[in-house]
């Protein structure tokens, strides 16, 4: 059997770190078993649709090297590749309608005849009686014939407790309280997530569904629908939340969470981001900290994913990034730095910039650090004249005399090929002899212009 996994984001905004980690785990499971990694766009929530979000999702996955086998094409998402499309849910309406009609014919679904006002009356009554509102308590005895423009609801056939084996969490179970007659097709003719993802996963022959632990509570109603449709569920794996640095809540924007796009613009390498995200909730049981994508594919398994939330630590990401920067060849690093050089370096000679980069490589933590670490290689340093004017001995020299001393000093220092304390000391002694100046004058000037 071919292992087939899917990542199914919604184009409703930027793709946050939790989603990207899910995409990574989904990708690794497929690649570890020489399987297929599917990208499906769940775009049925048109009210929250954000223009350009899909393109950003595709570009993020591409930058991280999470190449997909089926789904929208990178340069033109409207074009798709794969034998199980369409891969946009809004293009799969006919498929959902076919399944909906099948369910109606089998007595598994019914048209919802109630107005929102009528439903609110039901809710208010349940609240007044201090009981949970359940739609199944208000099933119409003779529902109208369903047609587009009317919501269609699942008629849950059996109210019972469900148990299942989760590939990450182990044995789980949840009871009847989660089961109700949920909507399959909305009034706008588009399916709900609860319905569409089950149909899509079945039609696309998905074998593993990897998603966040927030979906555990809804799993019984999914299992109820699988059972009603006589579909064998795929292997389910619910991964823990990424937690805020405090460790007591889910990571959010208020905790400094950024999008992958923001981290990319700050000079985080894709290798470091993958390395970091993989270890947010997973380890291979060793002390190894640096993992290439190939090593992750080789070593990753769902049974090594932890059950509890993983604490977000941005400083660790930055540390990993520094390690990856130091591992790159000079040519590779140079090619990645093109948009990060300071303005003063834009027109500098390439060979000179590479020499500068070689000196800075071990000190870079992010590519964004490049300008502040290298700017002085491209601009003449400004001499603080106030320091000179405040020195009693240097005030005795004219501007021309100071410039001549600096010129001679520079010439002598440029002759040094082996920079050691001894060679520097010898150079300074030679300068004293050449210029005839006292140490107090010459060394004070050298200290000021090199500080």
Give the predicted meaning of each segment.
Residues 1-128, 217-231:
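N-terminal Rossmann-like or analogous alpha/beta NTP/dinucleotide-binding catalytic cores
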Residues 5-11, 38-43, 204-209, 258, ...:
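Glycine- and acidic
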Residues 15-17, 263-271, 307-313, 346-356, ...:
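Structural motif
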Residues 52, 56, 95-98, 217-221, ...:
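Generic recognition of stable, solvent-exposed alpha-helical segments in well-folded globular domains
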Residues 86-90, 185-186, 204-216, 243-276, ...:
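Conserved phosphate-binding loops in nucleotide/dinucleotide-binding enzymes
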Residues 102, 109-238, 244-251, 259, ...:
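Active-site cores that bind ATP or allylic diphosphates and position pyrophosphate for catalysis
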Residues 330-435:
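Small-residue-rich helix-loop
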Residues 446:
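Hydrophobic, well-ordered secondary-structure elements that form the walls
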């Amino acid at each position: 059997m071919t292992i087939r996994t899917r990542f199914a984001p919604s184009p409703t905004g930027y793709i946050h770190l939790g989603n990207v980690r899910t995409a990574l785990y989904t990708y690794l499971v497929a690649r570890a078993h020489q399987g297929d990694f599917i990208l499906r766009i769940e775009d049925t929530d048109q009210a929250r649709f954000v223009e350009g979000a899909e393109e950003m999702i595709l570009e993020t996955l591409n930058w991280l090297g999470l190449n997909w086998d089926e789904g929208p094409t990178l340069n033109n998402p409207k074009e798709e590749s794969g034998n199980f499309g369409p891969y946009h849910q809004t293009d799969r309406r006919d498929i959902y309608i076919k399944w909906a009609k099948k369910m109606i014919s089998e007595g598994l679904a019914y048209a919802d005849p109630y107005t929102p006002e009528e439903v609110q009356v039901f809710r208010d009554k349940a609240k007044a009686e201090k009981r949970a509102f359940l739609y199944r308590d208000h099933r119409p005895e003779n529902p109208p014939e369903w047609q587009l423009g009317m919501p269609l609801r699942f008629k849950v056939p059996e109210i019972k407790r469900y148990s299942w084996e989760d590939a990450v969490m182990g044995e789980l179970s949840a009871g009847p309280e989660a089961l109700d007659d949920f909507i399959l097709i909305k009034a706008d003719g588009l399916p709900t997530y609860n319905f569409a993802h089950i149909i899509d996963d079945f039609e696309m022959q998905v074998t593993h569904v990897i998603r966040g632990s927030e979906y555990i509570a809804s799993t019984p109603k999914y299992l109820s629908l699988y059972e009603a449709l006589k579909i064998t569920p795929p292997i389910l794996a619910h991964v823990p939340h990424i937690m805020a640095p405090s460790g007591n809540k889910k990571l959010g924007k208020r905790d400094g969470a950024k999008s992958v796009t923001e981290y990319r613009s700050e000079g985080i390498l894709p290798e470091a981001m993958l390395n970091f995200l993989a270890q947010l909730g997973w380890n291979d049981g060793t002390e190894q900290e640096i993992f290439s994508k190939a090593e992750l594919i080789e070593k990753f398994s769902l049974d090594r994913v932890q059950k509890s939330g993983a604490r977000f630590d941005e400083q660790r990401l930055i540390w990993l990034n520094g390690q990856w920067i130091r591992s790159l060849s000079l040519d590779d690093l140079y090619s990645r730095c093109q948009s990060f050089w300071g303005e003063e370096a834009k027109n500098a000679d390439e060979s000179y910039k590479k020499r500068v980069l070689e000196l800075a490589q071990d000190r870079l933590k992010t590519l964004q650090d490049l300008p502040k670490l290298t700017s002085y290689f491209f601009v003449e340093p400004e001499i603080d004249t106030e320091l000179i004017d405040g020195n009693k001995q240097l005030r005795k020299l004219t501007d021309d005399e100071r410039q001549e001393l600096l010129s001679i000093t520079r010439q002598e220092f440029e002759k040094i090929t082996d920079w050691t304390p001894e060679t520097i000391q010898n150079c300074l002694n030679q300068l004293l002899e050449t210029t005839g100046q006292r140490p107090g004058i010459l060394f004070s000037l050298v200290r000021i212009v090199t500080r």
